[in-house]
Amino acid sequence: GAQLNVLSLTSEENMMTGEITNEQKRIDLPQMTEPVKNIFVDPRQQWLYVINGRAQADVFSLRDKSLNGRYKLLENGDAEITASTQLVGGISLIFGDSKGGLAQWFMARDPDGESRLKQIRTFQMGTTPIVEITAEERRKGFIALDASGKLGVFHSTAHRTLLVDQVVEGQGIFGLSPRANRVIVEAGGKIQPLLLENPHPEVSWSALWSKVWYENYDEPKYVWQSTAANTDFEPKLSLAPLTFGTLKAAFYAMLLAAPLAVAAAIYTAYFMAPGMRRKV
């Protein structure tokens, strides 16, 4: 097995003298029983994700210096994790397996209030192993390449498979531009540039009208929040709260307006002076 050690470096600057003090802390974690394939750390440095070859993720709490849990990533015992990455923001993990499947996982609280790694949504690209996954730098989208040379474009929040196309023959590697509008694929010693037009992948029927499980939420919800100050923001475009709010406002307005209109009509017809009624 492998021994994991986490080294934390902290720098503090004295406001009066400008002197910088460096502090180093070492966190010893339990020894791993399986070979480690990948390691991820969330931006807040709270969780350490260790992916091993048995399609299992060990999650460690860096604050408590303890094991949060061991999570089975695949139900199929014959499959294994072949590729993995973090989405922009570092909260979600995307795993690709040997059967062509992809899954999004992130930490969420269970009914007991404990944080657990949970599978949020899945995608199916084909039947051949996923060899590489790259996340977009500005949106909650990602691109995957399988062993047969198929390229897939996905968006996590909208739960959309935007494109699956054969771009090369056989296994290759690829690179994605910062704006996610160009892809370069290398296979068999040849480089193939591709132009990707993907203007609004975050919009889908489920994103607009269904409950969506957003990052940092404990369950799927209807939420509208179209913008934020940070660049790794996850758009929340549910029209359900807007529609319900509009209908509710109209209903309460009619409760007040309808009796006033009926009372005004009765007064005009039976009690208003004839001269005034002609002017009205």
Task: Set out the residue ranges of the language-model regions.
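Long, low-complexity, acidic Ser/Pro- and Gly-enriched intrinsically disordered regions
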Residues: A2-Q3, E12-N14, W47-Q56, S98-G101
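WD40-repeat beta-propellers
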Residues: L4-T10, A57-L62, L102-A108, L145, ...
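Periplasmic/extracellular loop-to-transmembrane helix junction in inner-membrane transport proteins
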Residues: E12-P43, K65-A79, A83-V88, E114-R138, ...
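Beta-strand-enriched, solvent-exposed domains that form extended recognition/catalytic surfaces
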Residues: S98-Q104, R116-V131, D146-S148, G152-H155
